[in-house]
Amino acid sequence: NDGKYSHGQNCIDELKKNGVITSHIGIHEGMHTNYHYVLWYDVDRTILVKHEHFPTSFPKDIQTPKMIYLSSLGEGTEDFHEEIMKYVVEHPEVKLVFQPGTFQMKMGIEKLKDIYKNTYAFFCNVEEAQRILNVEDNNIQNLFDKLHALGPKIIFITDGVKGAYASDGTESYFMPIYPHDPYERTGAGDAFASTVSVALLLGKTIKEALTWGPINSMSVVQFVGAQKGLLSMLQLEQHLRDA
């Protein structure tokens, strides 16, 4: 969803420039595009999030996708989550990727139990895992076990500069961060999750996918903002060859 003003049109133009189909994005007269403010100090930041209350609905004429990537949605989207849950249950061949945002964590496990139960790949950081599970334990394996019990088949947990972990319920993996000197960290988690998801969609193993994510995270934190610095597949593959 987008507002029918310059910021919204800029978003649409940027998506089109990068080859993203925008026909399912709703343009709403008289509404503003979501606008978030970032408080930036040293290499870290705090984001002040404000979601507009757009009308939402799952497209009826959509061709069955190979993957759905579900991330941050604002308050007032409970019915939309229900539609997504219903679609995923009715289309088990669709791989659901879930990277919950603030409101989705606030909704709690029970309201989203069918989302968790049918999730193919799940992404969060250590603090988010603790919040979702309502635990103080920061042991990665314990967090994996508790999250797998909710349903996700593959789980990825990031732990800042310590690196990232993955589990399929049988084996666990660890990947250190790609060596870099960060300038501003906004977008690192999104870059990691989306890049790993694409790698899985392309048929890469969990271990292979886990090598892709940190490279795009490394690149995006060299710049201000969440998009500048994102690598094309050719650029990413070159970094892999050079690693």
Language-model features, listed with the residues they occupy:
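Ribokinase/PfkB-type carbohydrate-kinase core domain
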Residues: 3-4, 9-27, 31, 39-121, ...
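Glycine-rich phosphate-binding loop of ATP-grasp-fold ATP-dependent ligases
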Residues: 34
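Conserved post-catalytic alpha-helical subdomain immediately downstream of the catalytic base
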Residues: 150-152, 176-242
